[in-house]
């Protein structure tokens, strides 16, 4: 019998790339003419980004700049969860953007069910915030990866630790 092959499914965001994207967005905001005299800012906190601006229109522009820089740095926009827009001091508006790290229990159940329903001969096991997929054939594992890439999930997935 062939030795089992396996890989892990994770959802991770490179914190350093996020920091770089935030710094680039701040630089662009400082140089853009439409932000002259504006008190708009982007702050990075642990696991989140805080966007502050004069009004909702400028906040939308700040969001667009940040998203463009994130995509340029290779960070998927599915890794961002936008909070609601709230009032801040002095006619300002604030929005919190959470960075999604790890696979939640609900998403792990969805992914496991999707794999089981596909009838591909592999086993899945949830290990904390990641999922281990193992099977006898490497082709089956590649079929699972293709299946998950096509699936419409609301999180960004990475496939790591491919062992055969």
UniProtKB/Swiss-Prot annotation:
Q: Per its database record, what is this protein's job? A: Nucleotide-binding protein.
Q: Name one GO molecular function term.
A: nucleotide binding
Q: Which SUPFAM superfamilies match?
A: YajQ-like (SSF89963)
Q: Quote the protein name from its UniProt record.
A: Nucleotide-binding protein Helmi_22490
Q: Enumerate the HAMAP family for this protein.
A: YajQ
What does UniProt list as this organism's lineage? Bacteria, Bacillati, Bacillota, Clostridia, Eubacteriales
Q: Provide GO CC annotations from the record.
A: cytosol
Which Gene3D superfamilies does the UniProt entry name for this protein? Answer: 3.30.70.860, YajQ-like, domain 2
Q: Does the keyword Nucleotide-binding apply?
A: yes
The text of the family note is:
Belongs to the YajQ family.
Give UniProt keywords alphabetically.
Answer: Nucleotide-binding
- InterPro entries in the record: DUF520, UPF0234-like_C, UPF0234_N, YajQ-like_sf
What's the domain of life for this entry? Bacteria
